Amino acid sequence: MKKYIYLCLAVLSIGIFASCKVKKGVEATFSDLDGSWNIVELNGKALNQVIEFDVARHSLSGKAGCNRMMGQVEYSDAHKNIIKFPQVATTRMACPDMGGERELLQALDKVVRFEAEGDVRPVNKIALYGTDNTKLMVIEKK
């Protein structure tokens, strides 16, 4: 009887530990962001815009729609994957449909962290998240 109980406990323990195993993908670093990226998803919708990161200068630039955008990137090695884009500026051309541009700029303002999508190096797809852990956008290396 004791053997049966020990066997059941062993099987149960193995099942619990196996179910707790979490597959962790590749961890994105700040230097992975360097270069040109396509914004392929914004708030769950497909998008085709370009954003560029200059890691050495802690800056970003790109096209927000019809206007150019530029700004600073706040990142600290002490807080991995935490990132912010404070005060992204744009040119001021008037365009017929500014809704998508506003949505992109609002999403950039809400970003607080980034994470690689996939489990291969080099990192070629990164998701940007807001404070409530909502995926705001996905960028893909050009």
Regions found by a protein language model. Give the residues of each.
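Bacterial Sec-dependent N-terminal signal peptides
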Residues: M1-T29
